């Protein structure tokens, strides 16, 4: 929580990053609340420790684990992928499998976009047929959709979007329901 850290008192990211790095080989950061902030902070943090290592301030550059940011949730998505690989009997059996990444209602509003974005980005890398299904207005970041499209083309899968849940569920091998806030709402929260 930045409000309880030295950042709230004017300490720079570089100062914080280097100080924490003196005490750790691995650092995990979770910063997912604001569009354009979390991933950018993680990059700035790693640039600071890389520079600190190059300048001789740090003996070594620690590894950063993205525990979740505004763009992706790689630890969750990799755990999901390992489960899927196991269930289908190996990574070679994933090509052509259909996964429906579907929006689901939750009484707690304002969930980050990182899980559905991570899923569509990762599963398309394995040649899966990924369908992103959500009500109108619940789009994810356009840049992430472009990554999913490119991954699908490169790896022999597909990426499609729909607002029709029945269409998404039809012939799906996997249905992954998850609540998330609309991209437009997340952008407003950031402003």
Model-inferred region functions:
Residues 1, 85-177, 183:
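Glycine-rich phosphate/diphosphate-binding loop of Rossmann-like nucleotide-binding domains
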Residues 1-85:
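Phosphate/diphosphate ligand-binding glycine-rich loop within oxidoreductases
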Residues 11-15, 113-118, 191:
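Charged helix-capping and loop-helix junction motifs
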Residues 14, 65, 139, 181-184:
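Generic, ordered loop/turn and secondary-structure boundary motif
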Residues 19, 23, 33, 46, ...:
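Detector for methionine-enriched segments
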Residues 30, 177-178:
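Short, well-ordered coil/turn residues at beta-beta hairpins
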Residues 33, 180-181:
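Flexible, active-site-proximal loop/turn residues at the rims of small-molecule/cofactor binding pockets
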Residues 37-39, 108-113, 182-191:
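Glycine/threonine-rich flexible loop motifs
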